[in-house]
């Protein structure tokens, strides 16, 4: 088993802001994907006063090979959750709130209305806060997507996750073409769009570049690229530890294709430097 390289080791700095956010989340019975997914940047983001809320529960109806989120049968959606998220955003003084979700294929609309309600609750309570959503593909359903589009999030994020060849192995319940279609429809609706590629699961450099080209072709504004970390021995193994220099090359190549902002480093995750990426996309 290849050892984790030095550049992937991050100290956990649980400063006062970090502790305050943790307390706010527990007080309001909210979940952060930062904790659920074991994100390596949790200290940096939380101490910077930003966090990603995960709505619709802690259990996902899909079982992607890279993901640490629980996959047992989900609970009922909590209708009060949007208001509690908005209260947390206000308490934390956020200027850029990120709302993500577990995939809820068990719900008729896939959870779209709940996400839209959360965006609207944040806007009502903290009008100056920018709101980014990171959503499932809603099985490509036009009506569900339109519900989210109509909430007019400042950034619409849907992750393609991996290159075309590895889709079936990495996320068997989704598809490359469907994810591109979802992002294209969001762009056509006039939203700033964003997607993420996880590397280290067996893709080649050429395939990563091709994936960026496919995202650029549908006018994706922001792309994040980060190194896969295996959450447990039951998940897909790490095939490659890509060195930091390669991420720098991908950033240059992606931005040369016309993507407004490529955030690429071994420790980058979807919401990493999200505020800065949104600023860059607005400047476009």
Question: PLM features: what roles do these ranges have?
Answer:
Residues 1-52, 56, 83, 87-90, ...:
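Auxiliary Fe-S-binding modules of radical SAM enzymes
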Residues 39, 60, 64-67:
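Short cysteine clusters
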Residues 44-47, 65, 69-72:
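Short functional micro-motifs and their immediate structural scaffolds
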Residues 63, 107, 166, 233, ...:
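Glycine/Thr-rich phosphate-binding loops of Rossmann-like dinucleotide-binding domains
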Residues 68-85, 91-184, 194-198, 222-224:
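Core AdoMet radical
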């Amino acid at each position: 088993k290849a050892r984790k390289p030095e550049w992937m080791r991050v100290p956990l700095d649980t400063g006062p802001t970090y502790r305050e956010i943790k307390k706010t989340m527990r007080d309001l019975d909210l979940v952060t994907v930062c904790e659920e997914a074991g994100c390596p940047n949790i200290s940096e983001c939380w101490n910077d006063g930003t966090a990603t809320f995960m709505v619709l529960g802690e259990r996902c109806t899909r079982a992607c090979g890279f993901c640490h989120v629980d996959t047992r049968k989900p609970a009922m959606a909590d209708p009060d959750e949007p208001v509690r998220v908005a209260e947390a955003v206000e308490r934390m003084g956020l200027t850029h709130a990120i709302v993500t979700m577990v995939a809820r294929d068990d719900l008729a609309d896939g959870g779209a209305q709940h996400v839209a309600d959360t965006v609207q609750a944040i806007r009502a309570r903290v009008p100056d806060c920018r709101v980014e959503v990171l959503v499932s593909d809603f099985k490509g359903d036009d009506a569900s997507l339109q519900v989210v589009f109509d909430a007019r999030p400042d950034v619409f994020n849907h992750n393609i996750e991996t290159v075309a060849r590895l889709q079936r192995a990495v996320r068997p319940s989704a598809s490359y073409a469907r994810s591109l279609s979802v992002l294209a429809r969001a762009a056509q609706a006039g939203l700033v769009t964003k997607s993420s590629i996880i590397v280290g699961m067996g893709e080649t450099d050429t395939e990563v570049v091709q994936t960026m080209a496919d995202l650029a072709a549908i006018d994706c504004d922001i792309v994040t690229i980060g190194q896969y970390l295996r959450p447990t021995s039951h998940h897909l193994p790490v095939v490659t530890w890509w060195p930091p220099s390669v991420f720098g090359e991908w950033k240059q190549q992606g931005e040369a294709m016309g993507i407004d902002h490529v955030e690429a480093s071994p420790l980058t995750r979807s919401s990493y430097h999200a505020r800065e990426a949104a600023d860059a996309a607005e400047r476009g």
